[in-house]
């Protein structure tokens, strides 16, 4: 799997921006992701461990142990010799290092495709520059109320965040804090499935494209309205300060790794984070509300003659408004791909 060896150097080159990439890729849950460009390396026992680039030996072990994870659908158009096959893959944007190497079924599907379609084209420098610019604190923006600012500062200190994070908008600061919650559970945006797929696709000579624009993503992440900013920061801290915040993320991540679509579909029922009509409206807007445009973008690429491997956050696959259902409504044959069972764990 020579292409994976080529993907790791690319992973190293963009690592400083990976958390910011994750911000754009997973706006639904404030505790999912955060920008590493502003993270202070852990130096004390109470700080979470920092992600590291896999060594040659670790990479070899990852390649040896790689197995299929996540949620894959085959998207078929037409019959006989004129038929075309594309793929829809539900990803997770915060993952364990052991998960970053695609398994054989996923790798073969990507290899057989013409292009990789992500929510954003995370390897386009213009996209990154626009994203970074939009996440920075805006001159003249109203400050947070003192009590809320103190609460945010206290949590930053607790999670060992460096001063550089203050360059971000307050909402992005809250999302930044979330990466440390993930690290405490052995998860990190640096190992996010989307960025790994982008590296592999580039090594394979595949085109990488975005299904959404930076403007679309940022519109869902930040606001210039002081009242909305305060609400986002307060609500985000409410989630981060929960004792079970890290465990909830770990449960969702493990559900993804095991391909348990039922758990992912019922996430709003067990996360204890969707309690009000406003919460439900926000979730609808952030997930189902974005799906029709992404489905149209996928269909446009397929109709242009490409076999597409579309990789989008797993929550976008759920329910009657999920991407599999929307593509089926467009006349495609959509079939969930079953992965081989993992080998049994042998006690040493």
Where would I find each of the regions flagged by the language model?
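Short hydrophobic "helix-edge" motifs at membrane interfaces and signal-peptide entry regions
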Residues: 20, 80-82, 303-304
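C-terminal soluble interaction/assembly domains
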Residues: 284-348
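Short, well-ordered alpha-helical scaffold segments within catalytic/effector domains
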Residues: 21, 103, 291-295
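N-terminal secretory signal peptides that target proteins for export/translocation
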Residues: 1-16
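Structured, acidic catalytic/metal-binding patches in enzyme active sites
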Residues: 40-67, 71-285
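Sec/Tat signal peptide C-region and signal peptidase I cleavage site
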Residues: 35-39
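Bacterial N-terminal signal peptides
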Residues: 17-33
């Amino acid at each position: 799997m020579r292409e994976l060896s080529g993907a790791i150097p690319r992973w190293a080159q963009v690592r400083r921006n990976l958390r910011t990439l994750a911000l754009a890729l997973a706006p639904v849950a404030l505790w999912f992701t955060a920008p590493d460009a502003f993270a202070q390396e852990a130096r004390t026992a109470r700080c979470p461990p920092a992600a590291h680039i896999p060594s040659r030996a670790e990479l070899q072990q990852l390649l040896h142990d790689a197995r299929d994870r996540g949620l894959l659908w085959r998207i078929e158009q037409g019959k006989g010799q004129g038929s075309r096959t594309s793929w829809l893959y539900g990803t997770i944007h915060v993952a364990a290092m052991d998960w970053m190497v695609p398994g054989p079924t996923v790798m073969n599907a990507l290899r057989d495709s013409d292009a990789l379609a992500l929510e954003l084209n995370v390897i386009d420098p213009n996209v990154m520059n626009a994203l970074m610019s939009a996440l920075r604190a805006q001159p003249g923006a109203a400050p947070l109320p003192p009590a809320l600012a103190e609460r945010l500062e206290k949590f930053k200190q607790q999670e060992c965040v460096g001063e550089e994070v203050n360059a971000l908008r307050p909402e992005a600061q809250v999302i930044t804090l979330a990466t440390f919650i993930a690290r405490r559970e052995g998860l990190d945006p640096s190992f996010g499935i989307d960025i790994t797929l982008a590296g592999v696709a580039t090594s394979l000579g595949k085109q990488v494209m975005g299904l959404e624009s930076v403007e679309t993503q940022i519109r869902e992440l930040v606001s210039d309205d002081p009242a909305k900013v305060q609400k986002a920061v307060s609500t985000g801290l409410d989630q981060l300060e929960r004792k079970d915040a890290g465990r909830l993320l770990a449960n969702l991540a493990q559900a993804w790794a095991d391909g348990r679509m039922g758990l992912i579909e019922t996430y709003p029922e067990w996360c204890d984070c969707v309690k009000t009509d406003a919460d439900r409206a926000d979730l609808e807007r952030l997930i189902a509300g974005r799906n029709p445009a992404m489905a149209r973008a996928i269909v446009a690429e397929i109709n242009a003659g490409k076999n597409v491997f579309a990789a989008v956050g797993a929550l976008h696959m759920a329910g009657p408004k999920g991407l599999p259902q929307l593509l089926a409504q467009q006349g495609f044959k959509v079939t969930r791909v079953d992965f081989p069972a993992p080998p049994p764990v042998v006690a040493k």
